[in-house]
């Protein structure tokens, strides 16, 4: 796989990540997420716009075209199927899974994807609770259910009294922070875990699990965790 294709797919998936998190996709956000300079990002975005993969809207946010979204979905599908394989079969430590899946997402064929779906018993979510998109396009299974309607971000919980919730999704941005994802795992903050959360004065959130050390998330990371109220 050549470097140009890898870069294009990485940008598409990052825009998809931002959309999932409810963060406006701007070139500045891509620069932050991928640790690239502003000029480099602008040059790549311009090339992708010429290639018909995205549009730069009037307010400067990035919009995926139909062609770009289809490719972004395919890349994310490969990424999350790879995560399932790495966790469920290979047993790779949680903190290493995201970075490894970022490599696999660029080289996996659709034939391998279909075989993985069978081997993994038709998964619809990643080990981190995120829906695997584009399964219908692959012709192997249904889209994930519309359970997202019941989910809220930690930053959307009311301030004040502690709130009991069930952890449902840890987004790609959270997974990319190795120290944070390790602390969350060690504290038992994983999908389907019941925890208590309290909003901190600075807009962050403290997660409390009996028998474990509390974990405090800054606003940016708390926004990237979805939960369901108990």
Swiss-Prot record:
Q: Keyword annotations for this protein?
A: Activator, Cytoplasm, DNA-binding, Iron, Repressor, Transcription, Transcription regulation
Q: Name one GO cellular component term.
A: peptidoglycan-based cell wall
One GO MF term attached to the UniProt entry: cadmium ion binding
Q: Where located?
A: Cytoplasm
The principal localisation class reads cytoplasm
Give the record's GO biological process terms.
catechol-containing siderophore biosynthetic process; negative regulation of DNA-templated transcription; regulation of DNA-templated transcription; response to oxidative stress
Pfam families noted in UniProt: DtxR, Fe_dep_repr_C, Fe_dep_repress
Report the residue ranges that make up the HTH dtxR-type domain in this protein: 4-65
Per the record, the similarity remark reads: Belongs to the DtxR/MntR family.
Q: What does this protein do?
A: Metal-dependent DNA-binding protein that controls transcription of many genes involved in iron metabolism. Acts as a repressor of siderophore biosynthesis and as a positive modulator of iron storage. Also regulates expression of transporters, proteins involved in siderophore synthesis, iron storage and transcriptional regulators.
What do we know about how this protein assembles, alone or with others? Answer: Homodimer.
Descriptive protein name:
Iron-dependent repressor IdeR
Source organism per UniProt: Mycobacterium tuberculosis (strain ATCC 25618 / H37Rv)
């Amino acid at each position: 796989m050549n470097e140009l294709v890898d870069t294009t797919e990485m940008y598409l998936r990052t825009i998809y990540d931002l959309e999932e998190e409810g963060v406006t996709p701007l070139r500045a956000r891509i620069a932050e997420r991928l640790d690239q300079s502003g000029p480099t990002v602008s040059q790549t975005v311009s090339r992708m716009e010429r290639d018909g993969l995205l549009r730069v809207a009037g307010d400067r946010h990035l919009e995926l075209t139909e062609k770009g979204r289809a490719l972004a979905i395919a890349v994310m599908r490969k990424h999350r199927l790879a995560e399932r394989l790495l966790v469920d079969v290979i047993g790779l430590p949680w903190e290493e899974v995201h970075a490894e899946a970022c490599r696999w997402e660029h080289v996996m064929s659709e034939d391998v994807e279909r075989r993985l779906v069978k081997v993994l018993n038709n998964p619809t979510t990643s080990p981190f609770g995120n829906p695997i998109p584009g399964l219908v396009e692959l012709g192997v299974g249904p889209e994930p259910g519309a359970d997202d309607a019941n989910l809220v971000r930690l930053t959307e919980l009311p301030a004040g009294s502690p709130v009991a919730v069930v952890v449902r999704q840890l987004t790609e941005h959270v997974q990319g922070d190795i120290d944070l994802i390790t602390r969350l795992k060690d504290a038992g903050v994983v999908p389907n875990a019941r925890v208590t959360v309290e909003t901190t004065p600075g807009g962050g959130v403290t997660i409390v699990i009996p028998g474990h050390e509390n974990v405090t998330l800054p606003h940016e990371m708390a926004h990237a965790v979805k939960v369901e109220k108990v």
